[in-house]
């Protein structure tokens, strides 16, 4: 019998099915202050991404994570080194509750995230827990980049590394690990956890290169005392005198002229919060000032995203975290928060004057099938859950802001100051962080149909292009499964979750 030749094994080439735009919550944006165009984003379930073109396109840095280590894909915080741009740190861990038994991991890279070394941490991290919108919890001392601080949850306090993140030790002198718990009686073990230490900000002017910074500010989820500072490089700590009470500090930034800006909400977020304020603290005169852009009586949301223009410390931007209707708010000030301009304003209800145009051509599905919006709403929206907002330190015209669905941005930001409209574009090209429940590929018709949590799913006519629309008839936020009839592939069924309050 003549032996048959062995059939060669076909080699497969794997690529992402393009969705573009992200499809999930962008929880943090961090520009490197030393290397132009280098920027990172973190997500709650989709890992971390790097851009080397200022945020136009992105590369996934955590595709190496195995199924067994799925918990690493929730990124609690991210830090890019202000001294050595090649160094990158990621605090990885998705849940601090009973949904996983995995502790967090500190990922260390010397090549901008191409490869990582890891340090196991003795506690859990919460990249997809309530308060993931706050930050950044992980920070590098600009006067000694071997020193890092990490704010943690669950009463674990503030931690410090003096060897580039290789080893960590708890800062025993730090007095407050946080007290805030949104709902102590939460039945599903999600809202009943301590939010903890939520951000760390160094004062570069308080030290010399190589010696470390003397002054450090730390934010804590505690409505009584939420901001602490040290004047001796972390040996002793005390509350910052005169600080606001009754609110939780979301984000903080220190401008080059010595102003500490803080956004506040009355809850941890990211979904809720019906009141907030914006404050600035003059670190030279030790004076506080409420610079909230909206009067207290009109505020129905908490504040989140915060940005300062590195080229002009008087330029400050803030965003509403929890304004869902009619849209989010973004404000811009060119005088240190004394006066503000909003990106839209009322023009006699239900009309609004918009100082921007939206371009979603890179991800047309971001209108979520709403082609004839009813005023005052528009489609697409500017966003929701805007926890992070950044101005490129090398380009005052470039802004990025994260939402619950995508990453948006502008390349003509300073037009706003001249009374002209700016353009907001999809900037999440390469970010794919959807939670896919099911896939089917019928023998005829489109290549692929997806069932996806939160954004319904898609008919993928071209795997190399973003879909034009999500499933809308009926409109289900999450599609949990999808299938077709074998004998009639054009007959398809999908099932999912519907919120009867919004879709009666």
Model-predicted segments: where are they?
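Extracellular glycan-interacting surfaces
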Residues: 1-504
């Amino acid at each position: 019998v003549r032996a048959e030749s062995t059939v060669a094994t076909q080699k497969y080439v794997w690529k992402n099915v393009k969705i573009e735009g992200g499809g999930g919550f962008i929880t943090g944006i961090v520009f490197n202050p030393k290397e132009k165009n280098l920027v990172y984003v973190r997500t709650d379930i989709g890992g971390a991404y790097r851009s080397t073109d200022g945020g136009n396109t992105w590369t996934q840095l955590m595709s190496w994570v195995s199924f067994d280590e799925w918990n690493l894909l929730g990124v609690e915080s991210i830090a890019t080194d202000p001294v050595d741009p090649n160094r990158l740190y990621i605090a990885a861990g998705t849940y601090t509750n009973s949904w996983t038994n995995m502790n967090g991991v500190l990922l260390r890279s010397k090549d901008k995230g191409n490869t990582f070394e890891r340090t196991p941490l003795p506690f859990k991290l919460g990249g997809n827990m309530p308060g993931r919108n706050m930050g950044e919890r992980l920070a590098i001392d600009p006067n000694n980049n071997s020193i890092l601080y990490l704010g943690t949850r669950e009463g674990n306090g503030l931690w410090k590394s003096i060897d580039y993140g290789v080893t960590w030790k708890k800062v025993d002198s730090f007095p407050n690990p946080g007290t805030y718990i949104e709902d102590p009686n939460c039945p599903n073990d999600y809202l009943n956890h301590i939010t903890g230490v939520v951000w760390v900000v160094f004062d570069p002017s308080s030290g010399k290169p190589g010696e470390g910074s003397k002054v450090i500010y730390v934010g804590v989820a505690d409505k009584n005392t939420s901001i602490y500072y040290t004047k001796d490089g972390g040996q002793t700590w005390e509350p910052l005198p005169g600080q606001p009470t009754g609110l939780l500090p979301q984000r903080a930034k220190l401008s080059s002229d010595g102003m500490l800006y803080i956004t506040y909400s009355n809850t941890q977020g990211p979904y809720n919060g019906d009141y907030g304020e914006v404050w600035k603290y003059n670190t030279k005169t030790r004076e506080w000032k409420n610079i909230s852009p909206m009067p207290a009586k009109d505020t129905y949301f908490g504040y989140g995203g915060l940005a300062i223009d590195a080229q002009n410390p008087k330029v400050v931007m803030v965003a509403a975290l929890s304004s869902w209707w009619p849209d989010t708010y973004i404000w811009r000030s060119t005088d240190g928060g004394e006066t503000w301009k909003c990106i839209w304003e009322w023009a006699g209800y239900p009309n609004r004057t918009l100082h921007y145009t939206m371009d979603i051509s890179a991800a047309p599905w971001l209108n979520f099938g709403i082609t004839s919006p009813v005023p005052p709403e528009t489609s697409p929206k500017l966003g929701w859950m805007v926890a992070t907002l950044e101005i490129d330190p090398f380009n005052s015209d470039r802004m990025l802001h994260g939402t619950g669905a995508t990453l948006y941005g502008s390349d003509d930001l300073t037009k706003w100051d001249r009374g002209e409209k700016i353009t907001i574009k999809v900037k999440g090209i390469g970010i794919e962080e959807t939670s896919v429940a099911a896939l089917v590929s019928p023998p005829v018709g489109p290549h692929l149909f997806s069932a996806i949590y939160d954004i319904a799913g898609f008919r993928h006519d071209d795997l190399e292009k973003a879909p034009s629309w999500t499933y809308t008839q009926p409109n289900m936020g999450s599609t949990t499964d999808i299938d077709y009839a074998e004998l009639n592939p054009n007959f398809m069924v999908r099932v999912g979750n519907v919120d009867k309050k919004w879709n009666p």
